[in-house]
Amino acid sequence: MAGLKILFVSQEITPYLPESEMALIGRNLPQGIQEKGREIRTFMPKFGCINERRNQLHEVIRLSGMNIIIDDTDHPLIIKVASIQAARMQIYFIDNEDYFQRKYILQDDKGTFFEDNDERAIFFARGVAE
């Protein structure tokens, strides 16, 4: 199992989103896997509430630039990366202006779910797979 490569995909990872059970799992599980000597890549959506400057996100040009078609519409895929220094772990962010620039994650400020959450989830999953 020495050459095992792991892809970890999570909707929430702390410190990028508020601490919750899922965000803590998204933060600690990949770190534990990495500490066991495994190669791991971690992905999450780049929601609009994530502060790019504070978290030092930057675009990975060589991975960005392709389009993902959803419902007969092209949507540019942007991939950004940041590091959790204490864990020596990189987190890759799937971004798209149409789907992830809102300041809320899955619901608006009134608690109403966004009507395109299904498309957003499809874009995220396909972006990770690409």
Which residue ranges define each predicted feature?
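Catalytic cores of nucleotide-sugar-dependent glycosyltransferases that transfer UDP/GDP/TDP-activated
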Residues: 1-130
